[in-house]
């Protein structure tokens, strides 16, 4: 998502395929250069516009640079992450799982002019898992399932 919002994605080592340079959408003034190291890491960051702590995970393979990186989306361990367009209306980040953070989600929706709900992500997940477990208990013969699996 973040990388394709930029102007170009270059892959000189052919990590993701044979195309050396791919044109992005150009919504952010950034360029990404693919690198061999893929990073998938649980991350805690601070969303700069709201000051909210964001818990999520970071996925990226490469380095993104450019003018819009001077307006980072967040910081993690005092390292800037992401970019915000000069207009302030387009942003990108390597952070995933942002909307599972209740305070960030409320801030984001409010800034879109929408009324945030009081939904608690963790409570909703627990409720859904409990409902699934109840359904499975009612409709699946667990002992038969286990004996077949052996």
Q: Which ranges hold each PLM region?
A:
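Short, glycine-/Ser/Thr-/acidic-enriched flexible segments
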Residues: 2-3, 32-33, 61-66, 97-100
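Hydrophobic, well-ordered secondary-structure elements that form the walls
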Residues: 25, 59, 96
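Short conserved micro-motifs at the rims of enzyme active sites and ligand-binding pockets
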Residues: 38, 68-70, 102-107
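Cysteine-nucleophile active-site neighborhood
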Residues: 1-55
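Short, low-complexity, polar/charged sequence segments that are solvent-exposed and flexible
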Residues: 14-17, 44-48, 75-79, 110-114
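Conserved NTP-handling cores and scaffolds of large molecular machines
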Residues: 9, 32, 66, 102, ...
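Acyltransferase
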Residues: 81-150
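Catalytic beta-strand/loop cores that center a nucleophilic Ser/Cys/Thr
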Residues: 46-88
């Amino acid at each position: 998502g973040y990388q394709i919002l930029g102007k170009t994605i270059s892959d000189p080592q052919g990590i993701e395929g044979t195309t050396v340079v791919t044109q992005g959408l150009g919504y952010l003034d950034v360029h990404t250069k693919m690198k061999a190291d893929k990073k998938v890491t649980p991350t805690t960051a601070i969303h700069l516009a709201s000051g909210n702590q964001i818990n999520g995970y970071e996925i990226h393979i490469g380095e993104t640079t450019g003018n819009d990186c001077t307006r980072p989306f967040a910081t993690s361990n005092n390292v800037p992450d992401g970019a915000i367009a000069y207009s302030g209306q387009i942003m990108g980040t390597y952070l995933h799982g942002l909307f599972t953070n209740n305070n960030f989600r409320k801030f984001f929706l409010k800034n879109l002019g929408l009324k945030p709900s009081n939904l608690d992500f963790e409570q909703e997940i627990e409720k859904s898992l409990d409902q699934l477990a109840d359904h499975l208990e009612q409709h699946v013969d667990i002992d038969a399932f286990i004996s077949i699996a052996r």
